[in-house]
Structures are given as structure tokens and as C-alpha cells.
Amino acid sequence: MKTNILKGLLIAILFLQGVTVSSQQGQNDNTKKRQIVLFDGKSTNAWKDIKSDHFPDSGWVVKDGVLTVLAKTDNQAGGHDIVTMEQFSGFELELEVRLSEGANSGIKYLVTNTYPGSKGQYLGLEYQLIDNEKHPDALLGRNGNRKMAALYDILPARENIKINPPGEWNKVKIIVDGNRVEHWLNGEKVIEYDRTLDCFKELVRITKYNKLENFGGQEQGHILLQGHGNEVSFREIRITTLE
């Protein structure tokens, strides 16, 4: 029984990564595009701490045109997650990311405050950022779905992708066009999936997100940069809306 389930999920993964949604072909022909710089190398006005209504006073630094979340150490707490002030539906997000050795982080999108309250918890689909060689979480999950550029805990990126090592910059792009989503890394598309397909929903069902109503089905949400206890740097963050 377990073997049949795993085979079915593997087939689903292969299908999702090769899917073409014909109903959305040409959808962008009449869209109104709006380009927004989310980080220009200086200003953090587009972002806020998930625990407040403003950019964090500590844990993140801007230097030489780079936005960096600090690592958690014995002497410093490290940075919290930050989210965009604005919410987005259809968009093309582009940025460059530099991991420190052994780092683990992520870029979440279509993020909502799932558990509002004094602290809140912002959850959404996640583009995994991780040092595949040095962080143990990369070996967990299923079929590589916690490795670099994966849709965290749901879908793995395709094999043999080009990843620049820690200390070097990687170019990341995330496209959300209706229900079709793409992950890109260093100029190559590494994942494509449709959020409405039953096979996608089945993959969500076997994750820790299975108790969240309509996880992954949000029409709009924030962009989130994750503070996960490791130093990670970001630059050239911009988004083009597809409305």
C-alpha cells in the first residue's frame, strides 16, 4: 500500500514539474504591469517585522547595498522574519540571495497572518534557500523537497540545477500567474506547478500544512524573507505585478 502511494506521488511530482496550463496561455497579453522596487540598496520602507508594524530595530542590517539577516549567536538574537507592507496576487519576484555556510532560510509568498494575535504567524508557500551540503534539513523531507529552490516540504526542484556555493550570489525568480507558479534559479526554471490540481493538494495533505484550510490557495498575500538563525543576504529585490 505504501509503495503504491509513493509511486503515485512521484508521478504527481513529475507531472507537476512538467505541467502546462493551457487555460492560462496568453493570460498576460492584457495584464497591467506595475514594477516595484522592494529594496534599492538603502531603503527598507517596503518591509516590516512580523511582530510589529515597522522594520525591525535589530537583527537586520543594510550595508553596501545589501540587506542581511544576522545569525543567532550567544551574543545576538538574530533577525525575525520580515514581510512586505503590501500584498500581491499575480507577480514576478526577482532578487539575488547569498547564503552563509550551512545556512537555512526561505522566501515565502502569498503569505497571510494565519494565526492573528499578539505575535501572529505568517505562513505561505516557500521557496527553499539552504546549503544542501552543510545543513541537515536538506536531507529530510521527501524526494529532495527540502533542498535548494524546492517548494518547501511539497515539491523538489528538478535534478542537476546550477547552484552557486555559499558566499556567492544566486539569482532567484518566483512567478505567480493565476494558479500557475514557477521557481527559477540562476536563469533556469526548476519547478512549475498548478495550485488547483488534485495531485498538488494531495502533496500538501501529507505535510505539516494539512490542518490549514486552503493552504496554498490564497488569492493574494505578502512576500516574506525568513530569519531562521543563519546569516543570509539579499539584494536587488524587485517585483512586477501581473494584474
Question: What are the residue ranges of the model-derived segments?
Answer:
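Bacterial Sec-dependent N-terminal signal peptides
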Residues: M1-Q27
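Carbohydrate-interacting regions of secretory-pathway proteins
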Residues: Q24-E243
